[in-house]
Regions:
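Short alpha-helical segment of the dimerization/phosphotransfer core of two-component systems
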Residues: 57-62
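Short alpha-helical Gxxx[C/S/T] motif in the catalytic ATP-binding
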Residues: 208, 212
Length: 243
């Protein structure tokens, strides 16, 4: 088990170092494009300006992809075990996302959540990804309405999910009124780079939910999704009190 942990940590460190090296040329490329555009903007035709816009969009997409791969590697690393009050973690996440929430006029209701043991950093990433997902995949005419609720797992549900009967678990649900998805894709959406909707309409690396899956797996929990096209989604987490 220690060898597996060491290997995962080494992979995570390698990917993080590689991501740092990849970001450097991307920064330089972005600076050079901006300089050329600023210096010669009056000489640029409408087509040339459009090409510059596309180049910048590609640079940002590459940055997003590199960052996503870094987070995916981190999520695969060993999960530490410290006290994590999910109420605090979710509130801190909402505070960081405040501008995005205001811009989208989103409403987020959060019921009392449990305290669990696990990786504080990974749980922050988990709820950040789920909330970003809920806000992003919405109909443009409708303001996002998100609810996070929680309850202890009972005996029957433990049996259904084949969970140890002597261990305490919590079920946490993240509901939204977004564009939803076809239920046949409920497992597929947790695979890396899977996109159910056009990239032109909804930006992103396609890694957010696969990172969520890695984090929950690290904590020996369960995550699954339920969707209804054009009506919304529900992401359910089954998390142990300790892992």
């Amino acid at each position: 088990m220690d060898e597996i942990k060491i290997y995962k940590d080494q992979v995570s460190d390698f990917v993080e170092a590689a991501a740092h090296d990849l970001h450097a040329p991307l920064r330089k490329l972005s600076i050079l494009v901006d300089r050329v555009f600023t210096k010669h903007t009056e000489q640029f035709s409408a087509d040339a300006k459009e090409y510059v816009t596309r180049i910048n969009a590609c640079i940002e997409e590459m940055r997003s992809l590199v960052d996503g791969l870094t987070e995916l590697a981190k999520a695969d690393a060993h999960a530490s075990s410290v006290d994590c009050d999910l109420n605090i973690i979710v509130q801190q996440t909402l505070d960081v996302m405040n501008e995005e929430i205001k811009e989208k006029r989103a409403k987020v209701a959060v019921d009392p959540l449990p305290a669990v043991k696990g990786s504080y950093i990974q749980y922050r990433q988990l709820f950040k990804n789920l909330l970003e997902n809920a806000i992003k995949f919405t109909n443009k005419e409708i303001s996002p309405d998100i609810c996070i609720s929680s309850e202890p797992i009972g005996k029957d549900e433990k049996s259904f999910f084949n969970l140890p009967p002597d261990k305490k678990y919590y079920k946490i649900e993240v509901d939204d009124n977004g564009i939803g998805f076809n239920q046949v894709n409920a497992e597929k959406i947790f695979e890396p780079f899977v996109r159910l909707h056009p990239k032109a309409e909804y930006e992103g690396s396609g890694l957010g939910l696969s990172i969520c899956k890695k984090i929950v797996d690290n904590h020996r929990g369960i995550i699954y999704a339920e969707g209804d096209e054009d009506k919304g989604s529900r992401f359910t987490l089954i998390l142990p009190e300790t892992h």
